């Protein structure tokens, strides 16, 4: 069998690119994927077209990677002061700034071409908003304590795009899902920001974790409650059944677990709570898919 052995420096460079794009850390991709699938399945009232499933699965992967590249570009001068990020390839000098920008542009271009070639005009128009949100979010932490709100919009923009691709229109359900996901993103990314709060305070990075202060867990709980309420509204308006509501109950139960994990506000507990949100999103998707299938 033919084997190709890459030179050591090439292998090291590819590994740095993979770390820059978070190929080794799929949690962000999964958190973006589940709400996209919610929209695809609900807009199709069952299984979406195979083409849209492939396009949006790949699009989620590419745009999340693009977002990581531009985020590290924006934060390159701050990341060296934060324990969790000081060894990132761009901060450590193993990847240059222009390379991160080029990767962002290239991945956005590939995603845009998929939309142009395989979806409809409405989805194409919406894609410009998605690209803009992906670009501006990383810079918001310089100017506002609500960068998580911009991240929520960026992470939720695939919902109207997926809906438009499948149904060629948008509905009230689209925006209910969008709102639920924005609130959910703010909740789980606040948990993530609590991991870095002490370092962020030192270097002047703004976040909801800093804004909320000692009320952080209470506000996260409020956001989580609002997510569950809105998803119940989605179920009622879409006339969904027991499987869907079981998925929402599972999400609510996991939200309680997240509060337990973050009870002492330490790095490990908050990070575990953040990671566990993957299962909350999956639970809703599984319930929705089963409900529409049966």
Curated annotation (Swiss-Prot):
Catalytic activity: all-trans-octaprenyl diphosphate + 4-hydroxybenzoate = 4-hydroxy-3-(all-trans-octaprenyl)benzoate + diphosphate
Main location as per UniProt: membrane
Keywords tagged on the record: Cell inner membrane, Cell membrane, Magnesium, Membrane, Transferase, Transmembrane, Transmembrane helix, Ubiquinone biosynthesis
GO biological process, one term: ubiquinone biosynthetic process
Membrane topology annotation: Multi-pass membrane protein
Pathway: Cofactor biosynthesis; ubiquinone biosynthesis
Cofactor(s) listed: Mg(2+)
GO molecular function, one term: 4-hydroxybenzoate polyprenyltransferase activity
Coiled coil: none
Pfam families for this protein: UbiA
Annotated transmembrane regions: 20-42, 98-118, 120-140, 145-165, 175-195, 218-238, 242-262, 274-294
Subcellular localization, as worded in the UniProt entry: Cell inner membrane
Similarity section: Belongs to the UbiA prenyltransferase family.
Function text: Catalyzes the prenylation of para-hydroxybenzoate (PHB) with an all-trans polyprenyl group. Mediates the second step in the final reaction sequence of ubiquinone-8 (UQ-8) biosynthesis, which is the condensation of the polyisoprenoid side chain with PHB, generating the first membrane-bound Q intermediate 3-octaprenyl-4-hydroxybenzoate.
HAMAP family named in the record: UbiA
Full protein name: 4-hydroxybenzoate octaprenyltransferase
Gene: ubiA
């Amino acid at each position: 069998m033919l084997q190709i052995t890459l030179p050591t420096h090439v292998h090291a460079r590819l590994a740095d690119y993979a770390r820059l794009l978070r190929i080794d850390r799929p949690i962000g991709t999964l958190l973006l994927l589940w709400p996209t699938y919610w929209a695809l399945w609900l807009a199709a009232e069952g299984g979406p077209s195979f083409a849209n499933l492939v396009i949006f699965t790949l699009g989620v992967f590419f745009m999340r990677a693009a977002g990581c590249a531009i985020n590290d570009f924006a934060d390159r001068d701050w990341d060296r002061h934060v324990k969790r990020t000081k060894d990132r390839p761009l901060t450590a000098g193993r990847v240059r700034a222009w390379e991160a920008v080029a990767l962002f542009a290239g991945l956005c271009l590939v995603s845009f071409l998929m939309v142009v070639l395989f979806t409809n005009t409405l989805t194409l128009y919406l894609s410009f908003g998605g690209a803009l949100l992906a670009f501006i979010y990383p810079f918001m932490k310089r100017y506002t304590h609500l960068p998580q709100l911009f991240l929520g919009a960026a992470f939720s923009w695939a919902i109207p795009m997926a809906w438009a691709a499948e149904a060629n229109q948008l509905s009230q359900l689209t925006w209910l899902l969008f709102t639920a996901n924005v609130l959910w993103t703010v909740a789980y990314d606040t948990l993530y920001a609590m991991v870095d709060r002490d370092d962020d305070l030192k270097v002047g990075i703004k976040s909801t974790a800093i804004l909320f202060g000692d009320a952080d867990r209470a506000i996260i709980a409020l956001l989580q409650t609002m997510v569950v309420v809105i998803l119940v509204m989605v179920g009622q308006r879409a006339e969904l059944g027991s499987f869907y509501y079981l998925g929402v109950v599972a999400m609510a139960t996991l939200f309680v677990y997240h509060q337990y994990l973050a009870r002492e506000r330490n790095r490990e507990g908050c990070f575990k709570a953040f990671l566990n949100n993957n299962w909350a999103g999956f639970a809703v998707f599984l319930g929705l898919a089963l409900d529409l299938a049966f």
